[in-house]
């Protein structure tokens, strides 16, 4: 993808903690070869979004996503991490749980704050009796309301949700 993704306009702190180095040595060459094969570059999205959109579009086919990126590995039922040389299998329930847990604890790699002072154990206790994703969403939104003033809670919840959510269609 070219340029910054839409998340930067939603969340000015998105990935602000990263120290970007020079682009990979052969990136321009790879881009040219992909272009020669008919691939298109799309602005405003991250590779995670495009991979998951493609996966959703062709959901009738079994797929395994190959990536070292922890974000994408956490949202796929089947994936392979080439850095660790390991396969990962996640149930739909685990994928949902990982997303909503990040809404509570944040994501340090992407500089998403979550709810200060709340960690994985808090998430586990909070959602222990939740029956479905809607129940989890409601519980977490209520925690944002409890922690922040109402306007700030809505703003933070929305900002974090859109920063964490992968576009899949």
Regions found by a protein language model. Give the residues of each.
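Extended two-metal-dependent nuclease catalytic cores across DNA- and RNA-processing enzymes
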Residues: 16-169
